[in-house]
Amino acid sequence: MKQFILSCVLSVAAIAPSQAQQANRQLPVYLDQTKPVEQRIDDAISRMTLAEKIRIIHAQSKFSSAGVPRLGFPDFWTDDGPHGVRPDVLWDEWEQAGQTNDSCVAFPALTCLAASWNPQMSRIYGEALGEEALYRGKDMILGPGVNIYRTPLNGRNFEYMGEDPFLASIMVVPYIQGLQSKGVSACVKHYCLNNDEEYRHQVNVIVSDRALHEIYLPAFKAAVEKGKTWGIMGAYNLYKNEHNCHNHWTLNKILKGDWKYDGVVVSDWGGAHDLEQSVKNGLDMEFGTWTDGLTMGATNAYDNYYLSMPYMKAIQEGKFTQKELDDKVRRVLRLFYRTTMNPNRPHGFLCSESHYAAARQIAEEGIVLLQNRNNVLPINTQKAKRVLVVGENAIKMMTVGGGSSSLKVQREISPLDGLKTRLGKDGIEVDYARGYVGDVTGNYNGVTTGQNLEDKRSEAELIAEAVEKAKTADYVIMFGGLNKSVFQDCEGHDRKHYELPYHQDKLIEALAKANRNFVYVNISGNAVAMPWKAKVAGIVQGWFIGSESGEALASILTGDANPSGKLPFTWVNSLKETGAHALNTYPGTWRQEGGASTKGNIIDEEYKEGIYVGYRWTDKERIKPTFAFGHGLSYTQFAISNLRSDKVQMKQDGTITFTVNVKNTGKRAGAETVQLYIHDVKASVDRPQKELKGFQKVYLQPGESKDISITINKEALSFYDEASSSWKAEAGKFEALVGNAADNLKLKKAFELF
């Protein structure tokens, strides 16, 4: 009997492979996971009709595009980021869908992430965001953003990673890798030169090739070549008189030509303007366009999109071949195989404690201690009996508003509540005074905060109450700054002024006079004027840090966490300390009378400062800013010493490694960021005094020391040569400058490139 059973098993086993092989032969190549992806794409394209091809390259709703149901490709869903997954809107309207499962964790704004100077935080950020997106059924997150901080008036700076192309390049890559490791596509934006918001649909940027390649493109290039991003979003603005959603130079020549990008180019919503350019100049997926006279309010307008019926009709009439169409379809199908057709894509989860922990950790590492006179911070919880909290930003929800990054959160802990909880553990009384009234609205696109911030008292009454309470407090902590209302840190418009709004300067000076233990916490994504800096004991840059904002700020202020953030931009004293404003090139010059109200009018904005953005400009002009790029204090002290290199001469195809010793000389555990800048001693072209080319964050216990090494190659020594349209590293003498901020580089090492 046993022998008979064994014979049967062997017979079945012999039959099974042939059946499996037969099944594989019957399986279409485009569904066969054993075949190379490009072969599967070829097969899918060969099976698709013209209508099916057209259908997948434009939107079918506010945030989705069609799949190919006949072949088993599902619909493709995008959603706004980059700080959390935006709540769902109706299929064809911008109103909220009214769902009960589309809350999210709000992660810190990308300025805060950049201020961590820690690529590990970027990876954690991307992974957590990807998991939330998966749970919500999203295939692409519209972010991260890496436009350069050119002017502090840009209403959208809070969504970006600062002024330095090297810092942004290093920080964006792990974010993309973390997000896409979950099978969710990144869509890096806004490519490119979208450096102010006010006239973003009409501004034509005039910039030198050198500045374009050295300042404004490197982070996008890193996103493509190192991050391997699957998506790029075109910007609204024009470059060389072509909109960047269908721009021959930026998309065809640079992105898809020079960088060999194999992903999709997605239009920003309403960013396509021309059929022929949309077809020929690199746009792959069109979203949100208002064409043929249709307005923003038009419904079911998708057939009128340039890459919809107008494109199909033009092909049928012989105006275009299917060559460009098949390239677009190939890229979209490649995206499908990476996301919706990926059988190994994990399951997501939403609002988990691990995600809140990630948000808090990122926030704590990004908060910057700017000033700490007489060691006013951290709050001495052993001696303090009463702490006064002042300011609207101590109680106002900051996750709602700001434009497309507005979120519907499961929870947001305010700074006031965070301090009450933390200080309450030590029996410390926490009092509150409003101090000023700013933006009392709590509604953005149907998402409401549920807060009533109305206060009818006069400015004088509000200040008087705060000052009176401040006189008897052990500490006064004011949470001020900006918010996410229009003309502040908000998409679509720029700030009107560099100064703090709502007469906060007057309140700050009064509080600083009333209590010597006064700490100002600036909540914003931008720098602000600080004419009262010398009168204030402590200054903290608190950013927009999302769901765990109160917890993270309380941890920093009480010393439970040691601040280690560093500024990702130069904090200037006034607008005239930036090239864009010193040279009067912002916001540009209108071509016709009537400005923005004249239909079709274009405003030309010339970046006359060239490569001199941020610290490059202040170095050139010998300006001492309020706070330098890379500046950030700690509750402990560090010594950076003994700079050495593994060689003094470097070949063109070689590398050089610099090593320093970092020691925690204080009494608290903490982290320091070692920054390496390169100075070209003599060059054939004008070069910045120094440029960031390496950094590393190191965590040390009291008394602990470590050697930190940073290796560079000739890329770190190169400039973009306009004559040859290529990067060039000239032989000669260079210096490595090492320290912990752009204005604190005490170590120098000479070397030579030959």
Task: Set out the residue ranges of the language-model regions.
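Short beta-strand elements
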Residues: 744-754
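Acidic/proline-rich low-complexity IDRs
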Residues: 2-5, 9, 506, 582, ...
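Bacterial Sec-dependent N-terminal signal peptides
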Residues: 1-26
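Glycoside hydrolase catalytic-domain context in secreted enzymes
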Residues: 17-719, 726-742
